[in-house]
Amino acid sequence: MRITKIAPAQSFEREFDGIATDKSISHRAAIFALLSSAPCEVEGYLMGEDTLHTLHIARELGLGIEQKGSVLRLIPPRNGICEPHKVLDCGNAGTGMRLFAGLLSGVKGHFVLTGDEYLNARPMKRITEPLSAIGACINGRENNAYAPLSIVGAQLQTFDYKSTIASAQVKSAMILAGLQTAGQSRFYEPLLSRNHTENMLRGMGVHIQERECEDGGYEVVFEGLKETNKQLEAFKFQVPADPSSAFYFAVAACVLGAKVKLKNVLLNKTRIEAFKILESMGAKVAYHHLSSLYEEVGDIEVQGGSLKAVRVDSRIAWLIDEIPALSICFALAKGKSEVYNAKELRVKESDRIRATITNLRVMGIRCEEFDDGFSVYGGELKRARVSSFGDHRIAMSFAIAQLACGGEIEDSECIDVSFPHFLTLLSQITAVENANES
């Protein structure tokens, strides 16, 4: 087990130009290239454990991969997706498993998707039920509730599906399944979730529309590719920095009263809600738009300062990955901060509500836990040894917390899932030391 020791840090002013590239877009680049009519090029594909598992699975399914420096050339299989000779290991990647499940449900062949102990404990009925309803032959443990998932490609039907949760993974799985039908399909969700799938597929030539509904929900309407026997157009783009990864250094600015400039960050509105929360707490945040191809990209400047408590209970899907890091700001804010409607946190890589509250208490902060959230009373962070709970976002969030007081993080290897050079960047702010314990 790796133990990471973090030393207390001083205020600073710094640009960060090496933030990990976006995990969501990297996953989709590898998967969507399988459907392309010609080779695709992607610069800056995230070389984290999650996205490498997705890339390896795409290779097993027939994707050719050539690398030159930071550019990957992704060559689609000449005769369509291949049936693999082995079980497809998604590692810790819930996005990879759920998107591949949607894609492979309509592909001829037999496919088995598995993951590590954490992924195989995460809920899968949210995709197995709607996919089965449109003709997919998909089976999993405990009445299709958990992976491993066994999929036999079938003839899928168009659909008009109303989801009860806002989940980009569920939506994307259904869209990938629906692309393999002849006709129009509709997917509804109660709040717009991350829409990278829609943006990228639109750029690849899919006729896909997003609309806000009268009840505040969103629907996606699109045409299956079998209607016109159409193949997707190739893509060529550079993956921007991941706003979820950049956010840790925004929190660092708030912890230390520092100023940071985060370079070339994805600015999709469904991904920067946590920065908006920092603004409402008293931090100064500025956005500088630089480019727009499939997605808006730009720089984000954050100036830390005195923070006030806040209540977070809406647009949770837009900041679900950042809530553990936000909790560090809550711990230093004046007053009582609250999070509600965030039950989804309990079924991520760890129970992130329980993990966050446990570690904050160890660091001397008064907290209360709810079924769907938690509250934090602002105070003073104290030096402590905390657990990552095997969750990369918990590990990085509390590494940032320890900038205020120093401390240690157990089982920090999980950081490599999404941000392999996080500790290298952190060492530009303070002393970081790794040690192994048996």
Swiss-Prot record:
Highest taxon of the lineage: Bacteria
Binding residue positions for phosphoenolpyruvate: 23, 94, 122, 169, 352, 393
Pathway connected to this protein: Metabolic intermediate biosynthesis; chorismate biosynthesis; chorismate from D-erythrose 4-phosphate and phosphoenolpyruvate: step 6/7
Residues bound to 3-phosphoshikimate: 23-24, 28, 167, 169, 321, 348
Self-association state and partner proteins as the record states: Monomer.
The entry's keywords: Amino-acid biosynthesis, Aromatic amino acid biosynthesis, Cytoplasm, Transferase
Function: Catalyzes the transfer of the enolpyruvyl moiety of phosphoenolpyruvate (PEP) to the 5-hydroxyl of shikimate-3-phosphate (S3P) to produce enolpyruvyl shikimate-3-phosphate and inorganic phosphate.
Family: Belongs to the EPSP synthase family.
Cytoplasm found in the keyword field: yes
GO molecular function terms listed in the Swiss-Prot or TrEMBL record: 3-phosphoshikimate 1-carboxyvinyltransferase activity
Annotated EC: 2.5.1.19
GO cellular component, one term: cytoplasm
Pfam families per the UniProt record, alphabetical: EPSP_synthase
Keyword flag Amino-acid biosynthesis: yes
The species this protein was found in: Helicobacter hepaticus (strain ATCC 51449 / 3B1)
Cysteines paired by S-S bonds: none
Compartment list: Cytoplasm
Signal peptide limits: none
Transmembrane segment boundaries: none
Main location: cytoplasm
Protein name in the entry: 3-phosphoshikimate 1-carboxyvinyltransferase
GO biological process: amino acid biosynthetic process; aromatic amino acid family biosynthetic process; chorismate biosynthetic process
Primary gene name: aroA
Catalytic activity: 3-phosphoshikimate + phosphoenolpyruvate = 5-O-(1-carboxyvinyl)-3-phosphoshikimate + phosphate
Catalytic residues of the enzyme: 321 (proton acceptor)
Matches recorded under PROSITE patterns: EPSP_SYNTHASE_1, EPSP_SYNTHASE_2
NCBIfam families reported in the protein's UniProt record: aroA (TIGR01356)
